[in-house]
């Protein structure tokens, strides 16, 4: 943490500082694999720093690494076509994250956590609300729709921005 702060402090003197976006994250949460708590196993930090472009704050929204490309492209206001199924993490969006874990696909949202084998539900953990069959069913529909859409786009080579 200290080294990152020192680097940013020194880089403020660079002429390109105002037009630079710093993105710091991890590619996995290795230390958390010992936990049985899914929210802890998959939680990784994401730090986006660009005083000219990003308002300071902390987001409690769910997101995953598939959202990084869309976030960066939108933040940099890049022109042209690109392929992504992610959402911009800096905008209001459906509050969920989909994470693959080997052959399993997981979805996190305020409604809860659901792990699916694409044949059946492997694990369901309700969110902050009282557990409901409707919430579980909604999460299952979301994760299956996400997987189906990804499959269709890949097999037909028809990626599009959603």
Model segments located where?
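Solvent-exposed soluble domains appended to multi-pass membrane proteins
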Residues: 1-162
